[in-house]
Amino acid sequence: PWIVMKSNIMNFPFYNTSTDFGSEVHRALEDIIHGNAKPEDFTGDVQRALENAMLAWEDLKSKYPGLEVVDTELDVDVPLNSVTNSEYPDLVMTGKIDVLFKHDSGYIIGDWKTDYAEKRASDHKRQLSVYKKMYSKLENVPEDQITTCVIFIALRETVNTGKFGWKVDIGRKSSPFPTFEGHLQKILGWKKDPEKFIETLLAHQEFQIYDDEDKL
């Protein structure tokens, strides 16, 4: 509830150097995929991440014959009630797919990640499971023909050891979508009953800390 309040009600901005680095790498990948740049056009960690992305791309090509890029930064917007039970027919779920691949047996929804570690892999996979369902509904593609893939391209140690690795993490057949749907239904419940949201928020530890600091 605290995250919902900060991002959707109080509209707190969020900036950090990791986000800046990730955005720069994403923009560069877009240019490279569309033939407007090469990894060697960049420097430092951005170049290293781009070189890792090319290695990961080649790895996917070796595992999925006929692999080619369909689109990048692909907007996917579908009615909310097409992916979950909802009494709000006007609500739309929006998302953006980093890269969509097509191969001889189906599609791959890829997500470039510049995280220094894999500890948030389950969160990323949950997000991709949502995009998978959304793309399936949008383009009428059976879900069993869509694979999801988190592509880590800047894996590092907490203490700088010089490591700068990559990993292709293919989604499992068992989808984490039900976990996301449970969270979504809770938020929809708050929309229907705002008092329940306030009760949950006031009981939340982060809000209590914030409230105590505000009294100082």
For every predicted segment, state its role.
Residues 1-35:
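Charged, glycine-rich intrinsically disordered N-terminal tails and low-complexity linkers that flank
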Residues 7-11, 31-39, 194-197, 201-208:
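Short loop/turn hinge sites at secondary-structure boundaries
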Residues 10-11, 15, 83-91, 165-171:
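Short, polar loop/linker segments at the starts of domains and inter-domain junctions
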Residues 17-21, 117-125:
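Active-site metal-coordination segments of metallo-dependent hydrolases
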Residues 28-115, 119, 137-147, 158:
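Catalytic cores of nuclease domains that cleave nucleic-acid phosphodiester backbones
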Residues 81, 135-216:
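Metal-dependent nuclease catalytic regions and adjoining charged, substrate-binding loops involved
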